[in-house]
């Protein structure tokens, strides 16, 4: 850090930052040399500015602005301006890695306290989702539904409920876990019956009556017992994801039906409830003219609309029965789950963005190992995302310490999976180095690249050996590597698909097929079919004489005779002249 601070370019930026309290990215890119911009020192530089209280901004926002040009002598201002203009004009063709580093450099580093805060936000979001699932009737209905499979050992208990140390469970602990599960499920089943009975009876009484209050107390008590039993069991992460996805799917279908009902209302100018009310008059053939006037369509279409409304209402009722709750409750669950997921997503995004520079610094250690640097960064980013998912702030480690292992593992695994799969022997590496050295010397002497013959002459090797060594020296490159000055294309866009037929060949094949059809059409039906089957003209699979004979219920010799006769007919000039142009050579 001290060596960095002693550099004149760094001192210049620090002076500018102290004068304004902030410094722009443009000034940093203009003043700092490339050896810092494209190295790990850039992280140290940003940390240095952060410690000095100098803010890095896109544009200067303060009135007391002192631009970088005021920190250099006046007679140097014109070249500096020219440099800035030239850099602006070439910004479209800048190295994508440099652009990426610049973008991630704009994200401020976060402290250990902020990491803990973000981890707690993730935990809070997970808690919202878990509480929603635990309080939903879908979970207990699902437990009861899976009970026979659990008893028959088709499903393991620890697949459904939360187990802190599943990997360390012995047979006795697993047995105790099953007993706890069955005990709580029995309580849930009993209280579910009490709850459903109370819910069905409470509807008969008004809210002010004594009976209503009795049943309300019974409902609250049963609900509390059920929730306590479920909370004692907990729910596995796998089951949380499964049920939350099911709830979101239900909410999506409910909203689709709601939108459909709104569309009906907009189209016919009548509320869905009012349209349904027309049905009792239609069944009695009463007020049909009035209904047609109100709806603006004939009575048959009104019947279809009512039928459509009832079908959709049946779908809603089926969902209510499946969930054991009302449509509104399902919507409320969905909103809570989405809120929790949003909280998790935002916190994870901030944690990932703040540590992208860590990925770059680790990826640099694995450069030149058979993978493009950008691919190393992307693989490292995948490892970073996994680290965010697995981070446990309560253990007291800094996130960067925890994430380094995941990032390194992702990069090393990618290198082993995607880099060279064939080991190059040591003697071949020596030969490759000889070719590279002679190529470099030739360029220094003559100012151009040598051809294979010239390298072979200098090394005293056969030309074929030079070609072979060059093939070994080839390094794999990414198909996603940007191509062109605008970086708007990828290398993969320019690789031809050899499996796709060219338009010219496709057109020629189509014309040839048509000519063959016309020629075959002049043969008798039996001969025509034999030729088609023998040469596979219909399905591309030629059949043997025996296979064709089996279909015609004749001997293979008879099929051979029919084929020979058909081919003699096809060789007649009146037929063969149509196909001669297609013979190669």
Swiss-Prot record:
An example Gene Ontology molecular-function term: sigma factor activity
Motif placement: Interaction with polymerase core subunit RpoC: 375-378
Annotated region (Sigma-70 factor domain-2), positions in chain: 351-421
InterPro entries, per the entry: RNA_pol_sigma-70_dom, RNA_pol_sigma70, RNA_pol_sigma70_r1_2, RNA_pol_sigma70_r2, RNA_pol_sigma70_r3, RNA_pol_sigma70_r4, RNA_pol_sigma_70_r1_1, RNA_pol_sigma_70_r1_1_sf
Compartment(s) of residence: Cytoplasm
Gene of this entry: rpoD
Alphabetized UniProt keyword annotations: Cytoplasm, DNA-binding, Sigma factor, Transcription, Transcription regulation
Region described as Disordered: 67-93
Presence of keyword Acetylation: no
Stretches the record annotates as Sigma-70 factor domain-4: 519-572
GO biological process: DNA-templated transcription initiation
Protein name: RNA polymerase sigma factor RpoD
GO cellular component, one term: cytoplasm
DNA-binding region as annotated in the record: 545-564
Family: Belongs to the sigma-70 factor family. RpoD/SigA subfamily.
Segments for region (Sigma-70 factor domain-3): 430-506
Physiological role: Sigma factors are initiation factors that promote the attachment of RNA polymerase to specific initiation sites and are then released. This sigma factor is the primary sigma factor during exponential growth.
Summary of subunit composition and partner proteins: Interacts transiently with the RNA polymerase catalytic core.
Organism: Leptospira interrogans serogroup Icterohaemorrhagiae serovar Lai (strain 56601)
